[in-house]
Amino acid sequence: MNNSLTIIGAGAWGSALAIALSHKFDKIFLLTKDKASSDALGKQHSALSKPYSQNIFIDYSYEVINHSKAVLIATPSSAFGSVLKNIKDNVNDIPIAWVTKGFDPETANLLHETFNHYLTGHHPCVISGPTFAAEIVEEKPAAIVVASKDKKTRDFWSDIIQTETLRAYTNSDIVGVQVGGSVKNILAIAAGIASGLGFGAKTQAALITRGLAEMTRLGVALGADKITFQGLSGLGDLVLTCSDDLSRNRRFGKELANNISTDDALKNINATVEGFKALKLVLKVARSNQIEMPICEQVLLVTEGKTTPKEAVT
């Protein structure tokens, strides 16, 4: 029986999941974007200060999908559509899920809509929740959500993703889980700005509480169940990302609080800041649905240099 997994995307999340799940599979194919990246990572053969196990194979060819029981996408949202386009002729009936967060930058759609466009015969499935890649590798206990409208699909992926230290919960609200995973990154930038300005826990509490309201309003407008936002992929992920400096988004906000330019703040982080990439897309969707998101609007003004960090928070 085939017991191999393909993970597309060898960044922090893809690598962390390859390491965490390596004991559950005979082979894990970890795909990079091109041969040069594959060769470089193959020589390094480690990520997040931990070596890859011997059954993790670095590659760049989608042909390895033909030898896998499942495919997990862990690319940035900007690459999600192109990945689906490139693999649609290889996957046949192979189950596919993703840990990618955000909206499709080309269409402003949620990613399950992009998925349905390219893979009409598959059941979309997203995996999201309050986790950091570094802590997954360190095997610190955590919980995550597997969301799909199809019960067999979410049960399948729950079994794949769950380990002794990573507990998987299932949810049928694929819209709500995606909205939570995207909006929380923007709110974490706001939390980072407040922290960088030296404001205290009460400010963080207010931002998280009112931010949750913004997230919920948008999600419900898009068809989500408001209860979803009280769970791991809503409040749980929001609290984590707003409260810990392992979050790139929070660190980015702290950089902005120093009154430096957005470009300089991004350079200082030197990694993908998902909340910044999602910011304009989320607000575009919110405005088109007449949803007010004042915290997110203030984050946009700060990144565009149209207001100061202090004015935005106060």
PLM region descriptions:
Residues 90, 114-122, 141-228:
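Internal alpha-helical scaffold of NAD(P)-dependent oxidoreductase catalytic cores
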Residues 191-192, 220-230, 234, 238-314:
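NAD(P)-dependent Rossmann-like dehydrogenase/reductase catalytic/cofactor-binding core
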Residues 1-60:
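NAD(P)+-binding Rossmann beta1-loop-alpha1 motif at the extreme N-terminus of oxidoreductases
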Residues 11, 15, 35, 58-59, ...:
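Electropositive phosphate-/nucleotide-binding environments in soluble metabolic enzymes
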Residues 98, 123-128, 168-172, 231, ...:
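General beta-strand structural signal in soluble alpha/beta enzymes
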Residues 66-67, 183, 235:
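Alpha-helix C-terminal capping/helix-to-coil transition sites in glycosyltransferase folds
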Residues 51-139, 157:
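Rossmann-like NAD(P)(H) cofactor-binding subdomain of soluble oxidoreductases
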